[in-house]
Amino acid sequence: MVFPIEAIVGLVTFTFLFFFLWTKKSQKPSKPLPPKIPGGWPVIGHLFHFNDDGDDRPLARKLGDLADKYGPVFTFRLGLPLVLVVSSYEAVKDCFSTNDAIFSNRPAFLYGDYLGYNNAMLFLANYGPYWRKNRKLVIQEVLSASRLEKFKHVRFARIQASIKNLYTRIDGNSSTINLTDWLEELNFGLIVKMIAGKNYESGKGDEQVERFKKAFKDFMILSMEFVLWDAFPIPLFKWVDFQGHVKAMKRTFKDIDSVFQNWLEEHINKREKMEVNAEGNEQDFIDVVLSKMSNEYLGEGYSRDTVIKATVFSLVLDAADTVALHINWGMALLINNQKALTKAQEEIDTKVGKDRWVEESDIKDLVYLQAIVKEVLRLYPPGPLLVPHENVEDCVVSGYHIPKGTRLFANVMKLQRDPKLWSDPDTFDPERFIATDIDFRGQYYKYIPFGSGRRSCPGMTYALQVEHLTMAHLIQGFNYRTPNDEPLDMKEGAGITIRKVNPVELIIAPRLAPELY
């Protein structure tokens, strides 16, 4: 992130110095405040602490180092907002069990206004009637186990088609396959098919989907950019656009919304012409939401169309990006741990055989595969800091006073590598999950890859189905080696998420009979 230092510091210091001193003076907590990392500046706090520091690791790693120095509960300021970082079992349980309702809000970020349908997207919405009913719609109607069961043929067919595409790329014993790109194409195509009924193949799909894919990538970049209002949330700074990010957000949103609007109108017209309004006739997620939602939604100021588009966008974000990212790490770990890969292949060969492909109904019997997925999620959680929370009133975490309006980062990556909770925490060892009943649902506060409490990820069931089935196909269908027969580089990229810097490039060979591809 690059900040226009002179402009920001001058304007903000002049405007907020008195306010900052007044609020600091007026604080009279009954309990001690958490440790605060040193180096903060007046008014702007620690805005520059993580900026151009020469450390290109993920933010979760940097915050983990600070936890080693200052403890598992500490704070810093990003402008005016106070940020609380927790990474111990006790602190995480305090936040998501004892204080779950108090930490149920989301901080206000400008991208939520300009890119997130004015915060109508489920993961951006504040806790309240709109959020509760929208989450109920998503969990009970769109992503319920019964609904996902009805769409399992779509998942299987799409994964099968992608596996066959991967097979056609094999050219002798020396051609290199970019598995990272393949996974991104698979997951993007799968979620577009399930949401809108669109068949997408890179370079061959319709123009709308290609345009949306570009806008989607722009969204991922813009949502992580520093915007002045995020650090100094008063109306004046909503109109200050030194870096041009607001202009870029508006342009990107226009592209995204036009695609969603076209998809929505296509579905409305189809339903009117074909009279597919009866229960059970839904062909994709947009059909499902249309059949369940009234014209005006909850009296919250959002139209039906806005809520549908915001909900669809939330599903795309959850599925297309984080699922591909996680499978990519999982396959990289298996390639670098050939004994684990061989054991997983032997399990599938024994339980399923080599004359058909793994199906979703087989997953329950593939215990070692399930352990692999759990272990990958432990080492590389899809949201290493979760989506930030904000407390709606003062509370206590680990004996510390946390004032109202504090932004919460739960460092899940640090938590799930805590040597007090995990033996050999940085080692890839699926066996650790074989004899335990630890699951993904956030009730074991040392393992919360999808979050915990009322703001946990609603797309967990879908993500796990796709991850298990995709990894099972890749494990069953091919043998792998690296081009230079050296372990894959596991360098992690900078940013809020944990992305692998270098793609997973492999030489692959089929394990099954040709007629199965």
Swiss-Prot record:
Outcome recorded upon mutating residue 231 to S: In CYP82E4v10
Lineage of source species: Eukaryota, Viridiplantae, Streptophyta, Embryophyta, Tracheophyta
Job of this protein: Involved in the biosynthesis of pyridine alkaloid natural products, leading mainly to the production of anabasine, anatabine, nicotine and nornicotine, effective deterrents against herbivores with antiparasitic and pesticide properties (neurotoxins); nornicotine serves as the precursor in the synthesis of the carcinogen compound N'-nitrosonornicotine (NNN). Catalyzes the demethylation of nicotine to form nornicotine.
GO term, biological process aspect, one: alkaloid metabolic process
Binding site for heme: 457
Cofactor: heme
Domain of life: Eukaryota
Organism of provenance: Nicotiana tabacum
Glycyl lysine isopeptide (Lys-Gly) (interchain with G-Cter in ubiquitin) crosslink residues: 254
Keywords: Alkaloid metabolism, Heme, Iron, Isopeptide bond, Membrane, Metal-binding, Methyltransferase, Monooxygenase, Oxidoreductase, Transferase, Transmembrane, Transmembrane helix, Ubl conjugation
Effect of residue 61 to Q: In CYP82E4v11
Gene from which this protein is expressed: CYP82E4
Cellular component aspect of the GO annotation: membrane
Record's protein name: Nicotine N-demethylase CYP82E4
